[in-house]
Amino acid sequence: MTVEQLSPHSKSHPLTGEEIRTAFLHFFAERGHQVLPSASLVPDDPTVLLTIAGMLPFKPVFLGHEERPSSRVVTSQKCIRTNDIENVGRTARHQTYFEMLGNFSFGDYFKKEAIQWAWELSTKTFGLDPKYLVVSIFREDDDAYEIWRNIIGVNPDRIIRMDEADNFWSSGPTGPCGPCSELYYDFNPELGNHCIDLEDDTRFIEFYNLVFMEFNRDSTGRLSSLSNCNIDTGMGLERMAQILQKVPNNYETDLIYPLLEKVAYLVGVDYQKTDKKTRISYKVIGDHIRACVQLISDGVSASNLGRGYILRRLLRRIVRHGRLLGIPKPFLIDLGEVAISLMKSTYPQLLERRDVILKELQREELRFLETLERGERLLADLLSNNPKEISGEQAFELYDTYGFPLELTQEIAEENSIEVDLKAFEKAMQRQRIRAKAASTTIDLTLQDTLDKAVRELKPTNFKGYECLTETSTVQAIFINGELAQEAQENDVIQVALDITPFYGESGGQIGDTGILFKESVTNCLIEIDSVIRNNDVFVHRGIVKNGRLQVGDIIQSQVHHINRRRAQINHTATHLLQASLKEIVGSEISQAGSLVSFERLRFDFHCSSPVSSEELEKVEKKINLWISESHSLVVKEMKIDDAKQAGAVAMFGEKYGTLVRVVDVPGVSMELCGGTHVANTADIGAFKIVGESGIAAGIRRIEAVAGPGVFDYFNARDSVVRILSERFKVQSNEIVDRVIALQDEVKLLGKSLIKAQEEIAFAKTSALVSKATAIKSSHYIIHRLDGVPSEALQSAAKVLVDQLGDCSAVLLAGTPTQSDPNKVILVAAFGAKTVAHGLHAGKFLGPIAKMCGGGGGGRPNFAQAGGRDAKPLDKALDLAREQLMGALL
């Protein structure tokens, strides 16, 4: 596929970001690559918080831990990196959220094909002139040099040899590794080939990286050749869009620029007329909102831990920069809508999760606005004394007592050209940690490596959970906060490894068992287990010591919570039936993409190109309940993996299988490779109910369902809602829908009537104000307080007054719009054309006035609006406005 095929008017209309993505995927699909959807931003890899690279979902394949999905794969992977967050908006190319286009070979083609296709894609499909391209290679990679020089024909002066730090990839100190080759775009080839410096990002931009995994490095550092060589590549979508669309930075591509325009609209300015420093805030907002929308879509909620903290930090930076620009009101919902609209065609799940995304944006924004206003007032008090620095104790008090993020304290300090004493801040944090007894519910990821190494020294756990729910066990190891410990005491949150366990460890989509560990009796020593994971065949039990003391070597009783186990068995068998029913009703090409089997419900993700219709869902559900009623007995047996696959057993990519596998067979219905726990007979499930179907990525659907007791819980909850609504509306249950529709229509009519009445009141009050205008020379001004008038009506009133008073006029209206929030303040300023020509700027005039009311705002020279959170100083603020306006007009 060429540029011309993608866009008939490509010579006058550059490729859009979406067309670039499509062209890349199509190019490699034509060359035998399987197109896979983007993985979630929340990775399976416990060593990283977020998906930071296109290859991350395939890391287990590259390391030889998992089977390859295909020998050739191509993806467009959404990624987030926050290590350079301070550079976002300040450079042309740094972003937190980006898409990485990548083609991968798992033991198939290698260096020659990868280089040839990279060149063909760049020069033919995307139409880049070869004279604008520069290539880098690892200094010792003569094979790559020969291919670039003699097969591709690149000028040797434009093939740059680089050191290991720049052009050699490795997965760690040991393991698979190999040289890289990168393609750069040269914005100024007329400068010639002498003294090419690829670190000069004003001239060069790297847009395509090819990694040739051909070696294995052992513990001594010695390199040996791999039997199967792999290819891992990455092309930044935003960077390629910058090049093809001929814009000065990634932010002004069609992937991001509409967000900058939306921010400019909210501020009331033309983005192209803003200065370089101001544009930093626009770019930060445009970048971060894309990251936030995608994170929330992938199930992340703002919090103070892990990836939740990353989301919270990004959201708070958006709000902070919005306030710097003078946006006077909450704006994340408006911005979120634009971000969803920009990305919805590639990620349809954004539309399906729109309400969840917008609700989380609004919730976190309102929460932070309160924190921000309080913290900024405190910081303003500190800065009013012109300190040389903000002490660590002051920064810590803002953080600990008022919830004001350290990063924002640093940013505000930097804006005022002073520093924060970070060493003293860290000391205060350390004292706080000592004072607060650790009872953390999470393990620091930086300690995960310690736990992994310790677990590798332990013997594999003997799992007895298929046969029994109680067992006598010996404590092999105890971990507290990821570190090895010899004993644990009351209230310690611990992880325990046992020699024998009846507890199922999370795998295959099924969550781990819950239960208790105790010595001779529960009064002697009791540990409540809330989850169990498998780490290299060692089952690690996580829980809290409720009483007594536990030591390594203790002999204890392990007891699984039988009700939760039973629910997991029901939901797991129901999941197998769901996959079988989907294959029968929707299509045999259905394949599993993921699953979750919990105690309360089940979730099944599967590859499917279109939504499953309501009729199909009804048939799927009916079929499953038929199989349940037919009382099929399950047959569980161990088989050689080749025999199992030959017998038709379904396997899933992502699961690790040995030569012997466990097969769960519902004769005539379903046969799967599965290590999970199941019921003995389908009749034990009782009932099955689908509660939701949605898309979570391009080509991947998700069904959520309940089974067994969960069905009764679901219907009881529904009945409770129906009963409450019937009582509330005083109608029968079958009349609720009609009543709701009627009420919706009534609310719409009342809303329109209310808005009309408010506008009439505002205009009535406005008419009386014209005669009260104050005259100064040839100008007239009105500064007046109007309470109980909504923002929109206040804006209309100000504009009407200026029209009536003429070009030599100035109007400032302010008030508290609602009785329900008496501290909320709205301010509006409108200036006539000659007043603006006189040198007055409505936005700049209104800002300091709003600040007196604990707020801020801004706008255009002729019109501005602002908000505040403190109505008490409003009258004094208006008096100040009168003084300043009179002085300016005299």
UniProtKB/Swiss-Prot annotation:
<comment type="function">
    <text>Catalyzes the attachment of alanine to tRNA(Ala) in a two-step reaction: alanine is first activated by ATP to form Ala-AMP and then transferred to the acceptor end of tRNA(Ala). Also edits incorrectly charged Ser-tRNA(Ala) and Gly-tRNA(Ala) via its editing domain.</text>
</comment>
<protein>
    <recommendedName>
        <fullName>Alanine--tRNA ligase</fullName>
        <ecNumber>6.1.1.7</ecNumber>
    </recommendedName>
</protein>
<feature type="binding site">
    <location>
        <position position="572"/>
    </location>
    <ligand>
        <name>Zn(2+)</name>
    </ligand>
</feature>
<feature type="binding site">
    <location>
        <position position="576"/>
    </location>
    <ligand>
        <name>Zn(2+)</name>
    </ligand>
</feature>
<keyword id="KW-0067">ATP-binding</keyword>
<keyword id="KW-0479">Metal-binding</keyword>
<dbReference type="Pfam" id="PF01411">
    <property type="entry name" value="tRNA-synt_2c"/>
</dbReference>
<keyword id="KW-0820">tRNA-binding</keyword>
<keyword id="KW-0648">Protein biosynthesis</keyword>
<keyword id="KW-0862">Zinc</keyword>
<keyword id="KW-0963">Cytoplasm</keyword>
<dbReference type="GO" id="GO:0005524">
    <property type="term" value="F:ATP binding"/>
</dbReference>
<dbReference type="GO" id="GO:0005829">
    <property type="term" value="C:cytosol"/>
</dbReference>
<comment type="similarity">
    <text>Belongs to the class-II aminoacyl-tRNA synthetase family.</text>
</comment>
<dbReference type="InterPro" id="IPR018163">
    <property type="entry name" value="Thr/Ala-tRNA-synth_IIc_edit"/>
</dbReference>
<dbReference type="InterPro" id="IPR012947">
    <property type="entry name" value="tRNA_SAD"/>
</dbReference>
<dbReference type="InterPro" id="IPR023033">
    <property type="entry name" value="Ala_tRNA_ligase_euk/bac"/>
</dbReference>
<dbReference type="InterPro" id="IPR050058">
    <property type="entry name" value="Ala-tRNA_ligase"/>
</dbReference>
<dbReference type="InterPro" id="IPR018165">
    <property type="entry name" value="Ala-tRNA-synth_IIc_core"/>
</dbReference>
<dbReference type="GO" id="GO:0002161">
    <property type="term" value="F:aminoacyl-tRNA deacylase activity"/>
</dbReference>
<dbReference type="InterPro" id="IPR009000">
    <property type="entry name" value="Transl_B-barrel_sf"/>
</dbReference>
<dbReference type="GO" id="GO:0004813">
    <property type="term" value="F:alanine-tRNA ligase activity"/>
</dbReference>
<keyword id="KW-0436">Ligase</keyword>
<dbReference type="InterPro" id="IPR018162">
    <property type="entry name" value="Ala-tRNA-ligase_IIc_anticod-bd"/>
</dbReference>
<dbReference type="GO" id="GO:0006419">
    <property type="term" value="P:alanyl-tRNA aminoacylation"/>
</dbReference>
<dbReference type="GO" id="GO:0008270">
    <property type="term" value="F:zinc ion binding"/>
</dbReference>
<dbReference type="InterPro" id="IPR045864">
    <property type="entry name" value="aa-tRNA-synth_II/BPL/LPL"/>
</dbReference>
<keyword id="KW-0694">RNA-binding</keyword>
<dbReference type="Pfam" id="PF07973">
    <property type="entry name" value="tRNA_SAD"/>
</dbReference>
<keyword id="KW-0030">Aminoacyl-tRNA synthetase</keyword>
<feature type="binding site">
    <location>
        <position position="678"/>
    </location>
    <ligand>
        <name>Zn(2+)</name>
    </ligand>
</feature>
<feature type="binding site">
    <location>
        <position position="674"/>
    </location>
    <ligand>
        <name>Zn(2+)</name>
    </ligand>
</feature>
<keyword id="KW-0547">Nucleotide-binding</keyword>
<dbReference type="GO" id="GO:0000049">
    <property type="term" value="F:tRNA binding"/>
</dbReference>
<dbReference type="InterPro" id="IPR018164">
    <property type="entry name" value="Ala-tRNA-synth_IIc_N"/>
</dbReference>
<dbReference type="InterPro" id="IPR002318">
    <property type="entry name" value="Ala-tRNA-lgiase_IIc"/>
</dbReference>
<dbReference type="InterPro" id="IPR003156">
    <property type="entry name" value="DHHA1_dom"/>
</dbReference>
<dbReference type="Pfam" id="PF02272">
    <property type="entry name" value="DHHA1"/>
</dbReference>
